[in-house]
Amino acid sequence: MLVVFPYQGSSIILESGNVNDYEVVYPQKVPSLPKGGVQNPQPETKYEDTMQYEFHVNGEPVVPHLEKNKGLFSEDYTETHYASDGREITTSPSVQDHCYYYGYIQNEADSSAAISACDGLKGHFKHQGETYFIEPLKLSNSEAHAIYKDENVEEEDETPKICGLTQTTWESDEPFKNTSLLIYTPEQNRYLQAKKYIEFYVAVDNRMYRHYKRNKTVIKRRVYELVNILNTIFRRLNFYIALIGLEIWSKRDKVNVQSDVKVTLKSFGKWREKKVAATQKEYNAQLLTRIDFNGNTVGLAALGALCSVKYSVAVIQDYSKRTSMVASTMAHEMGHNLGINHDRASCTSCGSNKCIMSTKRTKPAYRFSSCSVREHRRYLLRDRPQCILNKPLITDIVAPAICGNYFVEVGEECDCGSPRDCQSACCNAATCKLKHGAQCDSGECCRKCKFKKAGAKCRAVKDDCDLPERCTGRSAECPTDIFRRNGLPCQNNQGYCYNGKCPTLTNQCIAFMGPNVKVSRDSCFTLNQRGKGCGYCRMQNGAKFPCAAKDIKCGKLFCKKRNSKICNCLISPDDPNYGMVEPGTKCGDGVVCSNRKCVKLQRVY
């Protein structure tokens, strides 16, 4: 019989802050055996792949099922710090036997958990619609833990925190509601449902290093907890985040970290761009800093820039003791990178909690609103960012292969996740080998564990400018995407093919504003000759340059809703290319946009 000793406390100081109402529990580990009876022998590790605990909340038993987050670190994960003489020291530690878990509550469909088990249980879980936090009490010779709700934590600073991204929005959010009526094609559904991967790099500035008393172990544990929560949040969007590197600026900052968040973001973006150029490895990067940004701002990121060479970055103020608060900000800024705007007043689908893309932050958030999900899907279908579809290359892997992390590595034939998560009929989840008689596990050219016949269509035509791809009969993967020659007419002569797409002004307006929109009248585009406000052709070092008269439809995009006469445009102060007419767009008969100029087809194709 399980024995627990809960009691109520009035006030206590925990690692996460002052808590004025809490319950003390003594989590008991629950032995777990598969239905067959005896477990297969596993390599000796400090932390088990799966664990179960039981404790009581408000007198009711709660049993979290926890599974090690095997995809938390990439196989070529590195850690970098700097010696006292400024020398860069980079190591490739073995971090696969870690103590960071995700999971669910037994017998609860809509539940979740993100827990670290490094030194007791610390994290949060959702139980019966409420979010609870658990944390060890650090009492000598005691397994006591505190459980509390968010509203029981005394605020360090009651001022609502905000994101630094500001931009114009359409005069109503009606178009975003209408997007829910769109019906996706089978090809679009396959793309949206495909697993997506973000290779993630975290830099910690010198202020944060000094704030945590130059203790790299404490900093690493905090970052790991943050990324574990981030993973739990983004799994709902079918994204898997792999930490590929952690860099601690232990000697001095590598970028210009200022209270002006925009200056810091720009400086960090340039640093990342140089680092990517040196390593030829693409990733999304965030800078964690202890500097106090101006006003109530705690983060900033570029919108829709996840795969951008220059803008796939964000800066985050480590403003709270509570990892849940900082992780919510990290998720918010990564959401911007994934093309998601701030929520509008009508976007309420996160229960009693605030949604992640809320404009103000006073409490932790763990879910995206339905508006955010629609905007994210629209960004994916419009921009088709390729960097998120690529698993890390086997040739990049340095550390030993880990079966069960969804990454097919050296020595593996497949990897469908843990035995509990695996849904493949072709892959043995315990060994990461194909089952007897199977040729493949997944891929557009794999069906019922066999290669599809040569000539079978594996990628349908997406539009006028695309060409179908067919299986070879020798591989599970669909051949490289090919498309019609640039410059050929498309969509009833409304546009010209450009890199497999048919970019038109109308399609771009629909992509930004939803259905029932049109391109604005020509007089709106003459604003691009002003070189200020919403009208310009290019921006450099903050200065806006006007369009020549013949190039006005290659600058800012202007759209209208129904019979509106307003000249609508969309801008982002952090991405000068946001809301601009796309390259290759038809700007007249026989002419297209190239480098913000309207030029003849023959010159560019």
Curated annotation (Swiss-Prot):
What are the required cofactors?
Zn(2+)
Please report the organism this UniProt entry assigns to the protein.
Answer: Bungarus fasciatus
* Motif segment (D/ECD-tripeptide): 464-466
Broadest EC class assigned to this enzyme: hydrolase
Query: Which InterPro entries has this protein been placed in?
Result: ADAM_Cys-rich, Disintegrin_CS, Disintegrin_dom, Disintegrin_dom_sf, MetalloPept_cat_dom_sf, Peptidase_M12B, Peptidase_M12B_N, Reprolysin_adamalysin
Q: Name one GO cellular component term.
A: host extracellular space
Output this protein's name.
Answer: Zinc metalloproteinase-disintegrin-like BfMP
Glycosylation sites recorded in the entry for this protein:
178, 215
